[in-house]
């Protein structure tokens, strides 16, 4: 039997079981847990390689082979870190396993044929496209920024650069909802829109859901009163949608305890749980300890650095239409910015107590930095807290799975769309992101939407090959013509689909049905279901989890930063 050195094998086919990779310039290392390919029967495309007629490529017709195969991919997902081939058929993941020609190769479960395109996954890390659940739809260009960061699904609300949208993720009422659905239909990214949930009677909520809202947002700027919360959750239970809440910073309609009482035992998604983004001051962070609350962070406070506090005041004044000349407005802003709770947020993420990461796009958060900041936090926590339980000195697999779940599967579960997106699993949309390990989490090598390339770094168009400088991200064919409709999905409530909204508005994108939002809890948050008892000192803002103070130093230096953005 012929042999090949481990180094030569990795260079040719990518890492295999037991090999380790460093993620970007962090101190995080993954180790390959399993290899689904067959040694000696790997498929690879190119001159003198395997995927040729009668060798790795079979003779079958279109219906019997996959449309796209990603060869020798290193999959990083909440369920594992494995080496495999990925087959794509009709825009969805057909299989994860061994690709090739079953006529001449053993163990083939993904058939490569004349109709199959090849994406070279050798040496690449593949993740599911990110799901950002806190989008202020201030400008349509956010879609490009999100896609080029590795995010493929936007959930939020708004109507453009107006006061209501600058402050809240709300698309209010039937007319606004329909116009925005018509607008986002043209974007090459998956979209779901929130209606306004700040209503104390049910009729105005039902009509928004029937008009196309995939969920409702309660926000203090519109009134996050106990009556509105109670009513909104009643309608959510009735119509199977999720409720997102930015609670009452000023405690005008009630304190934290009144909000928890209004919520009862019903599930709700709490945004920026730390509080700098808004919510009961100073104790909204206690919601991390509630079994029916799905806690999330937005990225402006993540991770805690020496600059975090200083930049927040001005951002907050702009986003919430506050006047720096009015003392009460300044006091409102200052009440939300607390070093102690910001520091505790990092630790709660590392413990798996905060389940979701999101952006708060152009409304204090940065739409293109959800993934970067997630991994910066993971790195900071490894350096400050050491090896996570379940990990060892050789790999950080458990920590890596915990953090990738925060922006992929958990937000998808929270909003009833995990049957379509959020992980690299059979049957789901082939929204996949390929990374060179050195650029992991920072700059994708390819962003695929429903199996077709949507964005990629591309060199001089007049060059003889694709790579000469200047290289920058450009939209690819999934963003053009009718293909963009087949490559993206609009998420709608079941009620709006039954009411015929896609047909009435002539929506051309794929339609995804929101379901299963009301029978979940914190326990449903994969790798991030820890529910500690949170104590907060209202005078010093000290945070304790199960009696242990949560204290960490601000970072003075971060990975995945300036060295990646010189050009």
Swiss-Prot record:
Subcellular compartments: Cytoplasm
Indicate whether Metal-binding appears among the record's keywords: yes
Where's the Urease domain?
129-567
Q: In the record, which positions carry N6-carboxylysine? A: 217
Q: Which residues bind substrate?
A: 219
Pathway named in the protein's UniProt entry: Nitrogen metabolism; urea degradation; CO(2) and NH(3) from urea (urease route): step 1/1
Cofactor binding note? Binds 2 nickel ions per subunit.
Reaction catalysed by this enzyme: urea + 2 H2O + H(+) = hydrogencarbonate + 2 NH4(+)
Q: Which organism is it from?
A: Aliivibrio fischeri (strain ATCC 700601 / ES114)
Tell me which EC number(s) this protein carries.
3.5.1.5
Q: Which residues bind Ni(2+) 1?
A: 134, 136, 217, 360
Name the CDD domains on file. Answer: Urease_alpha (cd00375)
Question: This chain belongs to which protein, by name?
Answer: Urease subunit alpha
> How would you classify this enzyme at the top EC level?
hydrolase
Tell me the name of the encoding gene: ureC
Which cofactor does the UniProt annotation name?
Ni cation
């Amino acid at each position: 039997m012929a042999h090949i050195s481990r180094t030569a094998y990795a260079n040719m086919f990518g890492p295999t079981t037991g090999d380790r990779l460093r993620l970007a310039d962090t101190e995080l290392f993954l180790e390959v847990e399993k290899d689904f390919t067959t040694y000696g029967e790997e498929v690879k495309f190119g001159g003198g390689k395997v995927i040729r007629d009668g060798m790795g490529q079979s003779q079958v017709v279109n219906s019997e082979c996959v449309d796209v195969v990603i060869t020798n991919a290193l999959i990083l997902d909440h369920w594992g870190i494995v080496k495999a081939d990925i087959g794509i058929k009709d825009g969805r993941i057909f299989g994860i396993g061994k690709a090739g020609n079953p006529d001449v190769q053993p163990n083939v479960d993904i058939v490569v044929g004349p109709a199959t395109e090849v994406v070279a996954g050798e040496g690449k890390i593949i993740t599911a496209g990110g799901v950002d659940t806190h989008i202020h739809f201030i400008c349509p260009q956010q879609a490009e920024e999100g896609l080029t960061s590795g995010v493929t699904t936007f959930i939020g609300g708004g109507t453009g650069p107006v006061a209501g949208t600058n402050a809240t993720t709300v698309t209010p009422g039937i007319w606004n909802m329909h116009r925005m659905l018509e607008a986002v239909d043209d974007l090459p990214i998956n979209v779901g829109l929130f209606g306004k949930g700040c209503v104390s009677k049910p009729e105005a909520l039902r009509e928004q859901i029937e008009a196309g809202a995939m969920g409702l947002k309660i926000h203090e700027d519109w009134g996050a009163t106990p009556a509105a919360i109670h009513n909104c959750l009643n309608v959510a239970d009735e119509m199977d949608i999720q409720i997102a809440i930015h609670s009452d910073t000023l405690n005008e309609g009630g304190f934290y305890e009144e909000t928890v009482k209004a919520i009862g035992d019903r599930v709700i998604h709490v945004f920026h749980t730390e509080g700098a983004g808004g919510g009961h001051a100073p104790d909204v962070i206690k919601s991390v300890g509630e079994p029916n609350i799905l806690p999330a962070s937005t990225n402006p406070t993540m991770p805690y650095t020496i600059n975090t506090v200083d930049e927040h005041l001005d951002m907050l004044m702009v986003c919430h239409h506050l006047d720096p000349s009015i003392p009460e407005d300044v006091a409102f802003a200052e009440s939300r910015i607390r070093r102690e709770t910001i520091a505790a947020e990092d630790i709660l993420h590392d413990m798996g107590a905060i389940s979701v990461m999101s952006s708060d796009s152009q409304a204090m958060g940065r739409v293109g930095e959800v993934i970067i900041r997630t991994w910066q936090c993971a790195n900071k926590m490894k350096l400050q807290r050491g090896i996570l339980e379940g990990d060892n000195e050789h790999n950080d697999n458990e920590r890596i799975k915990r953090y990738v779940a925060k922006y992929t599967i958990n937000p998808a579960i929270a909003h009833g769309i995990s049957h379509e997106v959020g992980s690299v699993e059979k049957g789901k949309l082939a929204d996949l992101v390929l990374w060179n390990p050195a650029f992991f989490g920072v700059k994708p090598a390819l962003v695929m939407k429903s199996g077709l390339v949507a964005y990629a770094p591309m060199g001089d168009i007049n060059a003889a090959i694709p790579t000469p400088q200047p290289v920058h991200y450009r939209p690819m064919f999934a963003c053009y013509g009718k293909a963009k409709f087949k490559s993206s999905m609009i998420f709608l409530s079941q009620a709006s689909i039954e009411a015929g909204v896609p047909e009435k508005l002539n929506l051309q994108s794929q339609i995804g049905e929101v379901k299963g939002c009301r029978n979940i809890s914190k326990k449903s948050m994969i790798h991030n279901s820890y529910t500690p008892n949170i104590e907060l000192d209202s005078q010093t803002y000290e945070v304790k989890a199960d009696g242990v103070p949560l204290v960490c130093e601000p970072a003075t230096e971060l990975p995945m930063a300036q060295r990646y953005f010189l050009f």
